[in-house]
Amino acid sequence: PGHEYWQQEVDYTIDAVLDEESQRLSATEMITYQNNSPDTLTYLWFQLDQNRFRSDSIAELSGTFNGSSPDADSNDPARISLAQLRALQYQSDSDLGHRINAVSDSRENALAHTVVGTLMRVDLLEPLRPGDDIELRIDFEYYIVNGDVLSPRGGYEHFPDDERDGGNYIFALSQWFPRLVAYTDYEGWTNKEFLGSGEFTLEFGDYAVSMTVPADHIVSATGELQNPGEVLTRDQRNRL
């Protein structure tokens, strides 16, 4: 980068609650967006990666048939595996994708927002000028996908034979919260539809995340553990 290089900064404070019985995550995130660019911004773009699993997503509607196809002059039928059929039925029957319950600024003013596939545009009440920052709040929830059915990057797996009544679950969360699209000096907004593969550029920032989970769960994440005495047994602390 040259001497006039700049990069936006986005800080997140997220409070999330995991409902194991319904496999649903609900959360509130507070976002501080610092405009380090020379441009005045009137809207912000967010990524809603979980919308990729909706049955009406571009990824699903543009996907090609991946079963076995006979030659064009053959009378044999095309075939689809039971696993593929199960995945299609699961997406059709399930209410997947991010549900945005509210978007507001620091003064609790509701902000107009438009969801387009795996993207969401939030319109600002006032222009965000160079050097200024804005605080936003987003309330959201989504049903975590069944990893055994869709083989996603993150999801849940059920262990019905666990000693706990009704079995037990393990959850792996990825691409789970609405996050700012990168705004760059070479492209502007990098607001491209997520089709299920590839990686995205993200802005630098600080994260403060709290998770409320059932008492028999252990939360594992990157970062430095702040309260081991409150959340881990002595044996577990000794293993660290």
Regions found by a protein language model. Give the residues of each.
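Ligand-binding face of N-terminal immunoglobulin V-set domains in extracellular IgSF glycoproteins
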Residues: 22-52, 56-57, 68-74, 79-88
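A short, structured loop/turn motif at beta-sheet edges
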Residues: 20-22, 36-40, 105-107, 126-136, ...
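Beta-strand-rich interaction surfaces with strong enrichment in secreted/lumenal proteins
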Residues: 3, 14-17, 109-111, 123-128, ...
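N-terminal, polar/Ser/Thr-rich
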Residues: 1-26, 174
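Extended, low-hydrophobicity, Ser/Thr/Pro/Gly-biased non-transmembrane segments
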Residues: 69-102, 106, 139-240
